[in-house]
């Protein structure tokens, strides 16, 4: 993923990662950032990064709040036949990351992250993918509503994929 230090948001850092990878006994492939510095304000140079060896664009771990930036990223990625991968959660609705907003978080008085913080972003990006015809992957999906949104977007013709991890679907209340 692009969430390295430094962030893979330019050709020099990408080349550094690729060169370091060549010194290992395994194949190392790299993602590149969607936005410069993971700030969600300005796109990286997708063409330069693709030509440099990036295989996907993502601001992994950081949600992209700007709908216009996401749409622009999808349009550019579609032009280059490159996938995008999104971390879907709206920070405005999250009181405490890492715990579901529900009975347990309320009992412990620690806030939490409601499912709507995820599925509202999933809905937005699925519909933008449908409109732009971009290929997107929803990272570590965790709510049934999000799964249904992806399923619906796919039925409508969007090129949307999703992944999850055991802790995102098995640790429930």
Per-segment meaning from a language model:
Residues 1-2, 34, 60:
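Conserved residues at the C-terminal ends of beta-strands
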Residues 17-23, 46-51:
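Acidic (Asp/Glu)-rich catalytic clusters
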Residues 41-173:
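Histidine/acidic residue-rich metal-binding segments in metalloenzymes
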């Amino acid at each position: 993923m692009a969430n390295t230090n430094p962030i893979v948001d330019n050709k020099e850092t990408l080349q550094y990662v690729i060169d370091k990878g060549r010194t290992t006994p395994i194949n190392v492939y790299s993602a590149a950032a969607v936005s410069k510095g993971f700030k969600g304000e300005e796109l990286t140079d997708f063409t330069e990064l693709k030509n440099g060896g990036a295989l996907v664009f993502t601001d992994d771990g950081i949600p992209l709040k700007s709908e216009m930036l996401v749409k622009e990223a999808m349009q550019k990625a579609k032009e280059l036949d490159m996938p995008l991968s999104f971390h879907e959660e709206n920070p405005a609705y999250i009181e405490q990351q890492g715990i579901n907003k529900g009975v347990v978080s309320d009992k412990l008085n620690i806030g939490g992250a409601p499912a709507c913080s995820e599925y509202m972003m999933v809905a937005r990006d699925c519909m933008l993918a449908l409109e732009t015809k971009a290929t997107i992957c929803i990272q570590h999906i965790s709510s049934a509503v999000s799964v249904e949104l992806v399923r619906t977007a796919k039925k409508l013709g969007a090129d949307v994929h999703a992944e999850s991890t055991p802790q995102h679907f098995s640790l429930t209340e």
